[in-house]
Structures are given as structure tokens and as C-alpha cells.
């Protein structure tokens, strides 16, 4: 289970957030309030955190899930602050594109979850982001 805009920081200790049977994984916003991403992974799942797909200026957590008798699966939990937010870096889109290119080049099924602050119902909203996702073979579900 992934949570975007977790609003966690170093004042929130993991022991108070722990759920029995799950491992808490966090990527808190480094500067300012709000934002952040956290994921609860079941203890019985075989997975590995992919720090190589996480960038300091993007709020995300990437995991590789190892499934018996199947290819591994990449899952990215991403939070993109809204346009105009002081927390949305100027190079978010290019950094995000680099991460997606790296992830999809691994020939693994890839799931991207989270909040990209992109309204798919408006055809004019974030055309470049939509083109990028389509180019990478990712579909909005």
C-alpha cells in the first residue's frame, strides 16, 4: 500500500506508524512541510528497494518485487507537487523521464502509482507528461 502526501518528517518515528505484518518504507520531503511518500509492504513479500531509481529532487519510492516463477516487477510510488508549488523543481519532468527510461529499459513489468497532479480528463492538461507515459508504454488505469 502506497501513500502520497504522507506529510511525515523526522519527528514521526517509525514505531508509532508501524502496522503488524508490514514493513514501513519512507521518503519524506526534505525541505518544508507536506509531501512525501511512504509504502507499507507485507512482511511475507520478497522485494528490494531500488534507490538507483529514486532522485533527491523527486518524491518517490521504487521497489522491485520478486514473484515466484515470473519476471520481477518494478513498482514506483511517485508524488509530483502541483504546478506553481515551490516544491516542484524546475527539472522534475526531465528527471522523471530519465527514471522512467531507466526503469522501462529493464524489460520488467512496471507499475507507476501515486499522484502526478495531472488531470487525465482534460486533454490540454500536462500534454508532455501524458506523451512521456504513453511513449514509455505506461497506461492510465
Q: Which positions does each model-derived feature cover?
A:
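A shared catalytic/ligand-binding motif for oxyanion handling
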Residues: 1-141
Amino acid at each position: 500500500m502506497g501513500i502520497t502526501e504522507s506529510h511525515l518528517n523526522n519527528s514521526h518515528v517509525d514505531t508509532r506508524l508501524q502496522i503488524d505484518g508490514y514493513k514501513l518504507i519512507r521518503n519524506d520531503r526534505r525541505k518544508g512541510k507536506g509531501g512525501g511518500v511512504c509504502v507499507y509492504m507485507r512482511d511475507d513479500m520478497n522485494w528490494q528497494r531500488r534507490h538507483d531509481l529514486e532522485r533527491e529532487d523527486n518524491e518517490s519510492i521504487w521497489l522491485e518485487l520478486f514473484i515466484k516463477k515470473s519476471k520481477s516487477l518494478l513498482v514506483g510510488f511517485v508524488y509530483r507537487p502541483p504546478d506553481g508549488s515551490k516544491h516542484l523543481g524546475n527539472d522534475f519532468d526531465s528527471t522523471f523521464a530519465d527514471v522512467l527510461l531507466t526503469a522501462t529499459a529493464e524489460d520488467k513489468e512496471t507499475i507507476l502509482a501515486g499522484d502526478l497532479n495531472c488531470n487525465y480528463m482534460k486533454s490540454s492538461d500536462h500534454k508532455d507528461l501524458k506523451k512521456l507515459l504513453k511513449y514509455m508504454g505506461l497506461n492510465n488505469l
